[in-house]
Amino acid sequence: MNDKTIPVTQPSLPELAEFMPYLEKIWKNKWLTNNGPFHQELEEKLCEFLGVQHISLFNNATIALITALQALRITGEVITTPYSFVATSHAILWNGLTPVFVDIENDGYNIDYRKIEQAITPKTSAILPVHCYSTPCEVEEIQKIADNYGLKVIYDAAHAFGVNFKGGKVYLTMVIYQFLVSMRRKSSINFEGGAIISPDAKTKLRIDRLKNFGIADELTVTAPGINGKMSEINAAFGLVQLKHIEGSISKRKIIDSLYRNLLKGTPGITIFPGNINTNSNYSYFPILIDDGFHMSRDQAYELLKKNNILSRKYFYPLISNMPMYRGLISASVDNLPIANSVADKVLCLPIYTDLNEEIVVKITKLLLGKM
């Protein structure tokens, strides 16, 4: 069908000429890292864009998540979702903590807040939900539970940059962003970065020290920190990309709508509508393929691949079924029936800013057996 491979996602890059003046300034300043002027400017611009006061930039979102757990001095058990990229649970494990998995919603992909309370034990100290596929969790309900039990809440918002929820950008308590970054699902990383939104200046100060080896000043180290600093080049790229984020979202929205219209009403294919109070960033287009469709999920994946179209079984396998986690009591299939069922059915179709609408039509025709 295609001579050229269609990736499941692709970076949306500015014109190189737009980026060059930033590089020239970096070369002139000879300031490559350690809280340079572009780093400082990006923190300020992101605060304005998201409507928050305290942001800390990181070299990537995984290091940010590890640092957030460390900054809040989390101990014992952390309630989280099995339906996410593995970095979510790895960050918990790297802190010497135990992830406790809770099943996802029956009509979505996020953690089911109604099942959180039964997973709380005397060892529980935090809840780590994920805004999956850019759809916000039930943040108000989760916060009520956290307040009742004295728990911290850290949101992994890697999917949710630029998402509006009930009239405001998605954030609450502490948020980990993988922002302004497009990746070919880890196979070809172009620019990378992460950020933490903190609830107050004191928490931001601790985070900023932790990401810089725990250094407080030239003579004082206050904590066993790491190197999580964002470089000036990545910060500069973030500043350029921030100018285009709304336009990119608008273009992906068109692709999302086209997929929905072409696949609407197809027996055996489920497309969740998303939260009615949310304006998505349209970075993912997941469908669920069940026995009512004329081929299985895996057959659809192979058919697309045979025609040089890369889809992804995202998230399969579940985190809870991976070797380092499947021994946990909470990882049992009986405890996570919905997440396991969704993981066996999900297929993310190509969606990115520069995806041609004609390709979307061809992808859907191929799936529906019309070619």
From Swiss-Prot:
Keywords linked to the UniProt accession: Aminotransferase, Lipopolysaccharide biosynthesis, Pyridoxal phosphate, Transferase
Family, per entry: Belongs to the DegT/DnrJ/EryC1 family.
GO biological process: lipopolysaccharide biosynthetic process
Modified residues (N6-(pyridoxal phosphate)lysine): K186
Claim: Transcription regulation is one of the keywords in the record: no
Listed name of the protein: dTDP-4-amino-4,6-dideoxy-D-glucose transaminase
Pathway noted in the entry: Bacterial outer membrane biogenesis; lipopolysaccharide biosynthesis
